[in-house]
Amino acid sequence: MKFTRTLVLASTSLLATVATSQAQEVKRDTKKQGEVVLKPITIISHGKDNIEATGGTVLTYKDIEKLQPANVSELFSRQSSIAVSGGGGPSKRIHVLGMEQSNLAVSVDGVPQTATSWHHTGSNVIDPAFLKRVEVEAGAAAADSGFGAAAGAIRYETVNALDLLEPGKTFGARIIGSYGTNGRGFSGSTAAYGLKDGFDWLLMLHGTSGHNYKNGDGTEILGTEPAARNILGKAGYEFDGNRIDIGYERSRDKADRLIKMNMGLPGDTEYPLEVARDSVNIKYTRTDATDMWDPEVQFYYNRNDYWRNDYQNRTNGNMILKEDLYGGKLQNTFTIDYGKITAGIDFGKHDYNTDNYGHNDRRYRKFNTQQVGAFTQGRFEFDNGFSLSTGARYDYSRFADWNDEVFSDSGASVNGTLSYKFNEHIEVFAGASRTWLGYVLGDYGYVHARNNAFYTDPTFSPGRARNYKAGVNFGGADWSAGITLFDTRIAGLPNYDSQKLGNDPEEYRSRGFTLNARYIWNYTTIGATFTKAKVTAGDDPVLPNSGSFMPIGDMATLFIDQEIPDYNMKVGATLAWAGRISDEAATAANFYDQPAYTVVNAYAEWNPPAVKNMTLRVGVENLFNENYYERTSFAPSQNRGGIDAVWAPGRTFTFQTAFKF
């Protein structure tokens, strides 16, 4: 497509090569109005990994405020390396470089999250209304990122009272209301927060109510109505150099959905479905940490439920899944001359409960996994231009299946990333990791559809992963550019055939490169990203069947933000493009070619001078009403009498008013 060549060549010729820094934080010099300076490029900064400098993604609170995302598709709309499939909220699946997020260590406020339970549901995600920061560490993840980081890590961080309070105030509140066309309906968010005598607290509520949306051709897409009912509560207390944080998150989505939310089947109808998530955590840290004593202690409990218990034909769709995940982490960070070393232990137990259908006398199944690990990660900056992030962990994993058969094993993981900075403008880096994954259960929802004789293969073994990356960063006071090459391989994943749970014999692989760039001039920011990835199972391209590994081909984004201080206004736009995908393996499996698409989103925001605490915003998604399905969606095919994609929304306007007190 001509647009592809134009976008890539324009980005390359403008900036020579593209940046790893997808969302560089910007600091304005208050002495010189309008002057903007980007952070220096380096993989290590003040003892912390710079995720962006090695091809990852960081979304700051300012980035999220600009986007005002209604869902995770909009949250990652400016990142070509991250694809989100369409449909209603519970059906959205997040893929990083073509790998579903269950292949990464996902956490919310440091709390590990459960993997995707069923291949027809979406990824477990946090409500974007609660977020203040997102980090996506693609590829070789640090040892303290958590257990099972096969393809990297995703870290979501939610807001607290200290983030929202105005300077000098001890109480605040925020109210946001919006209405959207094309089924988006009404959305409301309220928050109250305060600070008194070392105690800070926050309570935030968010709800949505709408209808099924229509695609670009005007066809109603069943099962897509917004129906979120979410709560975030936090409290913190500081005393004598100690800090204790307690958090609770509650998520509910209850609406009529398709029986298989990620695909359209002939004669599809909707059925009641409820997806629920509860998370509680408590964390201890020090506010007066020293070089040798900077502890962090955290304990957590997660509950995930999936209820579809009144489907008309029990042998084909009645389904109840329940998961409980609880554990903790104890670590300390040591500061030395050239950096920091973090060491600790983490542990967790994951309980699974499923109902069953079919001709068997076992109505329910229960099984579990357990993990205990020790880790250390060092991050160093040396005077000679070298920086190093390296670490290791050792884990014990245990799996007890539904027949009370027990499997146990242990293994080591190592990682390292080395960089050399020639000067303040050029840095090269290379990194690698080998990760032991323990017993991976993956898409355990298959167990729901197996008879009483289903068992675990006695040779079932732990999974493993390898990651390699290398690249170059360039940067100046107002621009950044770079390229990252990546290669991720994952093996030993589960295979639920008709008789037993065993290991998938295939090695899954994602390899390619990412290009990203950013230029800032006064109040204007322009950015671009490009990702090219080849995703395979063994020697063959993966099929576009909404699985854990999906073909993404070529994807690109281009965005611009403009502040207009004289009028208290901000405007911006995002263009997302995906190239056509056609391969013989998909054709042989009766899939149609995936067409290219180009989607444009835009927004305008205004703070009325007479009401300084009010913000008015209008946004439009899919400005030109493109009829498309998002990359990593289940692609149309001739199978089962004709499978259709869950098409993305057509043109949608959103009108928002926000008050902050």
UniProtKB/Swiss-Prot annotation:
Residues 170-661 form the TBDR beta-barrel domain. PANTHER family: HEME_HEMOPEXIN UTILIZATION PROTEIN C, TONB-DEPENDENT OUTER MEMBRANE RECEPTOR. Residues 1-23 form the signal peptide. Belongs to the TonB-dependent receptor family. GO terms for molecular function: siderophore uptake transmembrane transporter activity. The gene is bhuA. It is a multi-pass membrane protein. It comes from the Bacteria. One of its GO terms (cellular component) is cell outer membrane. Transmembrane segments: none annotated. Keywords: Cell outer membrane, Membrane, Receptor, Signal, TonB box, Transmembrane, Transmembrane beta strand, Transport. PROSITE patterns: TONB_DEPENDENT_REC_3 (PS52016). Heme transporter. Residues 48-159 form the TBDR plug domain. InterPro entries: Plug_dom, Plug_dom_sf, TonB-dep_rcpt-like, TonB-dep_rcpt_b-brl, TonB_rcpt_b-brl_sf. It is found in: Cell outer membrane. Its main location: membrane. Induction: Induced in absence of iron. This is Heme transporter BhuA. The lineage of its organism: Bacteria, Pseudomonadati, Pseudomonadota, Alphaproteobacteria, Hyphomicrobiales.
